[in-house]
């Protein structure tokens, strides 16, 4: 037993130094680790709770990638671009503001070029017109009115040139530069001062039982109205009541003029219709017909009284008889009427007979200045004695309000049957349409009227050509004619309500009235239709200083040979 114990003891003794050495190493390592943990804990106590630098250091250690420079740029550059795009408004950086002048330069250049060409054309036109004025004044002693008119046309043309040059530089409705309007007080086409205070008149105070039977046979309605006005003068001189002819012998005057209004204007009965005369004539009650005691002819040539057998037959059909032969107090030719005085008329046509007739006095030339003055030679309280009846006047006013307005030019463009009539005169008054259009355009330019009313008997082919040639400043000036009857239009309602529609004489008087109310009137030389319009304009106070005959002071640039 003792032997076994000895061997164990011996083994333990031999291993003891090595074990001590290992134990010592373990103790040192343990102490070292304990010291490290202690130091680490002390440092942790000294650091803030969220140490960013420590976190970044640990992240770098955790996520450290072995990337090259190119790889880094490839990865991070798109991210940077996306972030910048989301956080920045690029609209202000990429929108380019180009000045308006850059876009307008081409347009403005074109407008300037166009206006320069227009101004050059107008300057050449002005030069031509000035030469024409110069040549005209050298060869003729022009009146001051002609010179004023010509000068104004050039001023108007000069104004157009100014506007043409300034037009590219205008914006909106701004007017650049001055105006010459201030130099023309009252405008370029002022109303004519009729000086009514200086009228020379005669009192018409007829004897109630003495009558003058009007005989008007020459020409159309306008001739008859002028003839009727002269008959009024004769009736006033002879102190007689004037009998208006029957529509069965003459025109239907009661549809065109207001006969009762004439009596109102004078404050007494001075005119009666044929029907009224028939009722009150004392001879008719005895003999059952109207008797003309004396028939006096103003003209003896080419035939007495300008009355033929046909008219005598018509008078008899009315129940009118003529006593004795046609009487002629003097030698007077229609082709060459002489000037007569009021005293001569009174001396040669005075009679004690109850009913006398004088015919035809349309061509009579008695106290012309007296007869032609505004309002006529008879004293009255109206503007004129013979004027359209109230229905026609109102219809004309409604037409003007509907289609024309206040400022318009009226043109009486006589064509039918006028070519032969005018070419028999020297100079001729029948103008080619292009020449007529040129004359009309000049007046439109002067008046500055936006529209032209056309009273004409011309064919559509002629009026169509005229319309196409009426161009001012590149714009067509509209021609307005009375349209055909349309139930949708109400301006002419008064006429058809009173049964006057479709009457050619009513329509002619309506045309006259519209022309008489215009701002400026262009008439046809030699036409009594025009002369009656001028009479109305003079009496109504609508006459303008610019009123004229078509192409006045000009001759047709082409005249056909005679047959």
Swiss-Prot record:
<dbReference type="GO" id="GO:0006004">
    <property type="term" value="P:fucose metabolic process"/>
</dbReference>
<feature type="binding site">
    <location>
        <begin position="528"/>
        <end position="529"/>
    </location>
    <ligand>
        <name>substrate</name>
    </ligand>
</feature>
<keyword id="KW-0472">Membrane</keyword>
<feature type="transmembrane region" description="Helical; Signal-anchor for type II membrane protein">
    <location>
        <begin position="73"/>
        <end position="93"/>
    </location>
</feature>
<feature type="glycosylation site" description="N-linked (GlcNAc...) asparagine">
    <location>
        <position position="339"/>
    </location>
</feature>
<feature type="binding site">
    <location>
        <begin position="412"/>
        <end position="414"/>
    </location>
    <ligand>
        <name>substrate</name>
    </ligand>
</feature>
<protein>
    <recommendedName>
        <fullName>O-fucosyltransferase 14</fullName>
        <ecNumber>2.4.1.-</ecNumber>
    </recommendedName>
</protein>
<feature type="compositionally biased region" description="Low complexity">
    <location>
        <begin position="1"/>
        <end position="16"/>
    </location>
</feature>
<comment type="pathway">
    <text>Glycan metabolism.</text>
</comment>
<keyword id="KW-0294">Fucose metabolism</keyword>
<keyword id="KW-0808">Transferase</keyword>
<dbReference type="InterPro" id="IPR045130">
    <property type="entry name" value="OFUT2-like"/>
</dbReference>
<dbReference type="GO" id="GO:0016020">
    <property type="term" value="C:membrane"/>
</dbReference>
<feature type="region of interest" description="Disordered">
    <location>
        <begin position="1"/>
        <end position="25"/>
    </location>
</feature>
<feature type="glycosylation site" description="N-linked (GlcNAc...) asparagine">
    <location>
        <position position="135"/>
    </location>
</feature>
<keyword id="KW-0119">Carbohydrate metabolism</keyword>
<keyword id="KW-0325">Glycoprotein</keyword>
<keyword id="KW-0735">Signal-anchor</keyword>
<feature type="glycosylation site" description="N-linked (GlcNAc...) asparagine">
    <location>
        <position position="140"/>
    </location>
</feature>
<keyword id="KW-0328">Glycosyltransferase</keyword>
<dbReference type="GO" id="GO:0046922">
    <property type="term" value="F:peptide-O-fucosyltransferase activity"/>
</dbReference>
<keyword id="KW-1133">Transmembrane helix</keyword>
<comment type="similarity">
    <text>Belongs to the glycosyltransferase GT106 family.</text>
</comment>
<keyword id="KW-0812">Transmembrane</keyword>
